């Protein structure tokens, strides 16, 4: 709740104008939203709207669209779904107390309340249980971390069953970050080990709200703004998106002219690859993997050299494999189809410096074209 962004980065986004979109499983609005980070960073709640400095793009993994002045829309979501989502934090709270008391029997209620406030995220479209606060209590005890992960995954599945009992059978799914891929429509939790913290949060998301579907939505919007014609239709949203990457590629090939397809730079920090039971079989996942793979394949199909960038966030708030220490181990593998064009080993600060320079050069280049 105290995070800030470098103001130069916010203005660099503004310089890129219609060529920049954010695509995140966080949210724009609310006390924990990115809009509050923008306002804190600029020391103003008025300037971001007046100067159109909010981050344009999709949040809640593809549900919540926002333009630069903070106007928000969320097509494809029913009132019944929103009403249920609003109840989820209150459904989680008593279950949270029971789980924490079982794992930490010596913890008093004051401390439980403290960790509940940090762990239960009452975001509008993506109520979340985050483990980091509880992980701090167990330090390097990977068995305790596993117990936390397994207990809360079970709890979140109970929330899904509650939704189904209220007539919302095909409305929601659990997004686990980071994960080890998708099996039978469910994301596989990445259990903690001694050298990898594993999954750190579980979100209840609206079914269909995945980042690769978000790419389609943003692509449709970009081309519509550029040409006046939306290839997938003006009312396209995540619920209209094909489920598979192949289906998404086929839709693009059928409806988008090659001259209208832009070069896309995809940036992510959550990609995983782990050997399965010590065999030469890898479980590949991470909340950024699918949309980065989609961008890469899309470029290949249209003969465009799309770029894939990986930002190493291992030195941040979450323990993750470090490219500096172990290369791409735990992130990618020799047989991985996803290939990175750039890796920022020094993390977000290095990436932000590069981004600011890129935005300046791109802006100057476009100005020269108009002279």
Can you describe what each PLM-predicted range is?
Residues 1, 62, 270:
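Anionic group-transfer/hydrolysis microenvironments
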Residues 4-124:
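Active-site phosphate-binding/coordination module
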Residues 3-10, 34-42, 81-104, 141-167, ...:
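Well-ordered, non-membrane alpha-helical segments in soluble/globular domains
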Residues 113-264, 269-277:
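Conserved acidic, metal-coordinating active-site core of Asp-based
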Residues 205-208, 212-371:
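Mg2+-dependent phosphoryl-transfer enzymes with acidic/Ser/Thr/Gly-rich catalytic loops
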Residues 63-68, 128, 316-319:
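A short acidic, often aromatic-flanked loop/helix-cap motif at beta-alpha or helix-coil junctions
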Residues 68-80, 101-110, 165-170, 217-222, ...:
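Short secondary-structure transition/capping segments
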